[in-house]
């Protein structure tokens, strides 16, 4: 899928291995991986950071191959899932950063333009999340309250 507000085509990307079984050299069991996922989530790690740290420290390439369920599902079962989806959270964080910059530099028209792009991306992303129930149906992004969502 191409980029929304730029000329990038989005062609490059990695593909998952065909064999879905955990590698023979993978040492941790499913229960150990689940415990580690919960421990890292309690420390405040996002699901993608959890996956990266499991890959780097324990050698778990794909959590789903070892445990049978994805990281976010493990977090939901244990009640540790984030309230706002990760991609939306990072977009809101970016909008808050640009907003803080614009309060110091009011004449930055390029920054204002990019803030509009980020906010439109946020609005477009919230629609499917509201429809499938990830977010509340009356959830709405407001730039005034965005810093409380990210904090």
Curated annotation (Swiss-Prot):
Q: Keyword Ribosomal protein: yes or no?
A: yes
| Ranges where the record places region Disordered | 1-20
Q: Which GO terms describe its cellular component?
A: cytosolic small ribosomal subunit; nucleolus; small-subunit processome
Q: Keywords for this entry?
A: Cytoplasm, Nucleus, Ribonucleoprotein, Ribosomal protein
**What is an annotated GO biological process for this record, any one?**
ribosomal small subunit biogenesis
Matching entries from InterPro entries are given as: Ribosomal_uS15 (IPR000589), Ribosomal_uS15_arc_euk (IPR023029), Ribosomal_uS15_N (IPR012606), uS15_NS1_RNA-bd_sf (IPR009068)
- Disulfide-bonded cysteines: none
Q: Which Gene3D superfamilies match?
A: 4.10.860.130, S15/NS1, RNA-binding (1.10.287.10)
Molecular functions (GO terms):
small ribosomal subunit rRNA binding; structural constituent of ribosome
- Please indicate if the UniProt record lists Cytoplasm as a keyword: yes
List where in the cell it is found.
Cytoplasm; Nucleus, Nucleolus
Question: One of this protein's Pfam families, by short name?
Answer: Ribosomal_S13_N
What does this chain do?
Component of the small ribosomal subunit. The ribosome is a large ribonucleoprotein complex responsible for the synthesis of proteins in the cell. Part of the small subunit (SSU) processome, first precursor of the small eukaryotic ribosomal subunit. During the assembly of the SSU processome in the nucleolus, many ribosome biogenesis factors, an RNA chaperone and ribosomal proteins associate with the nascent pre-rRNA and work in concert to generate RNA folding, modifications, rearrangements and cleavage as well as targeted degradation of pre-ribosomal RNA by the RNA exosome.
**How does this polypeptide assemble, per the annotation?**
Component of the small ribosomal subunit. Part of the small subunit (SSU) processome, composed of more than 70 proteins and the RNA chaperone small nucleolar RNA (snoRNA) U3.
What family does the database annotate? Belongs to the universal ribosomal protein uS15 family.
Name of the protein this chain belongs to: Small ribosomal subunit protein uS15
Q: Identify the species of origin.
A: Dictyostelium discoideum
Q: Recall the taxonomic lineage recorded for the source organism.
A: Eukaryota, Amoebozoa, Evosea, Eumycetozoa, Dictyostelia
Q: Which gene encodes it?
A: rps13
């Amino acid at each position: 899928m191409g980029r929304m507000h730029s000329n990038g085509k989005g062609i490059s990307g990695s593909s998952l291995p065909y064999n879905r079984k955990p590698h023979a050299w993978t040492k941790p069991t499913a229960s150990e991986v689940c415990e580690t996922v919960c421990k890292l989530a309690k420390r405040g790690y996002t699901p993608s950071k959890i996956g990266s740290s499991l890959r780097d420290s324990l050698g778990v390439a794909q959590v789903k191959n070892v445990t049978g369920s994805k990281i976010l599902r493990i977090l939901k079962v244990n009640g540790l899932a984030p309230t706002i989806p990760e991609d939306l959270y990072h977009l809101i964080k970016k909008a808050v950063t640009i907003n803080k910059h614009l309060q110091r530099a009011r004449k930055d028209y390029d920054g204002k333009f990019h803030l509009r792009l980020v906010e439109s991306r946020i609005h477009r992303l919230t629609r499917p999340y509201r429809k499938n129930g990830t977010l509340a149906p009356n959830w709405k992004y407001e730039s005034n309250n965005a810093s409380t969502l990210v904090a």
